A protein has these predicted regions:
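Bacterial N-terminal signal peptides that target proteins for export
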Residues: 1-8
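Disulfide-stabilized extracellular ectodomain repeats and their linkers
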Residues: 44-47, 60, 87, 147, ...
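Flexible coil segments in periplasmic/lumen-exposed cytochrome c-class electron-transfer proteins
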Residues: 23-29, 33, 37, 44, ...
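C-terminal motif of bacterial Sec signal peptides marking the signal peptidase cleavage site
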Residues: 16-19
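Hydrophobic helical h-region of N-terminal Sec-dependent signal peptides
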Residues: 8-14
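Residues that flank catalytic or metal-binding motifs in active/ligand-binding sites
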Residues: 59, 86, 105, 159, ...
Length: 230
């Protein structure tokens, strides 16, 4: 009888233990905000509103794009998160710059975004363009390239919108224009640099020329302010 009571007591203890949630790490959403390093949580709460739920189809720069991630240096991507983009809607995110994120959280975002990288193949005889301008552009050749490859969608009166409009050019930096030409918006139907030269890829100089042409149309009062914004 005594053995039976002991066995019953043991069974009750065991059933009580198995009915409870096992101890373990708290979920990311249960951690204090400064301790969250889960990429999905950080991205959803801080980035998806502008850059889309999966790095695409947001109003801001597409991040989940093979060409973009192939050309932007890791250090540049990290600095954009830390310091933001002057003159744009991209704020500084690092605590050191007045933002909410710790260095560990910045690194978690950089690592998560870079995990979206995919192999990029370049057309025969072509190389990936440089993220930043390496040589000055020629606006005369840039205008020729614009008329041939961009005007149908982005000229005056075009349905998609004129990117040569002075108001638009007052708001964007030279680097913003360059990145948009290189990367495009495949998620929204805008091609990237590979087909903007009458169906052929633009080379690095072509891209600089296009930027130079568009910058030449920028209002004088905005030219100095935006020219050196990275």
């Amino acid at each position: 009888m005594r053995l039976s009571l002991c066995a019953l007591a043991g069974a009750l203890v065991l059933s009580t233990l198995t009915a409870c949630d096992p101890p373990g790490q708290p979920k990311a959403e249960e951690l204090p905000a400064a301790q969250v390093t889960d990429f999905k949580v950080l991205y959803t709460e801080n980035c998806s509103g502008c850059h889309g739920d999966n790095g695409q189809k947001g109003p801001g720069r597409i991040l989940n794009d093979a060409v973009y991630l192939a050309v932007i240096p890791r250090e540049t991507l990290k600095n954009v998160l830390i310091y933001g983009r002057a003159g744009t809607a991209m704020p500084a995110w690092a605590i050191s710059e007045g933002g909410p994120l710790t260095p560990q959280q910045i690194d978690a975002l950089v690592n998560g975004i870079e995990a979206w990288k995919k192999p990029v193949t370049t057309p025969p005889g072509a190389a990936l363009p440089s993220y930043a301008e390496t040589t000055p552009g020629d606006p005369v050749n840039g205008k020729r390239l614009f008329v041939r490859g961009c005007y149908a969608c982005h000229g005056q009166g075009a349905l998609i919108g004129p990117v040569t409009d002075p108001s638009y050019l007052s708001l964007v930096s030279n680097q913003n224009i360059r990145t948009s030409i290189i990367v495009g918006r495949l998620d929204l139907g805008m091609p990237n640099y590979r087909v903007l030269n009458a169906g052929h890829p633009l080379n690095d100089q072509d891209i600089s020329d296009l930027v130079a042409y568009m910058v030449s149309l920028r209002p004088a009062e905005a030219a100095m302010e935006n020219a050196n914004t990275k």
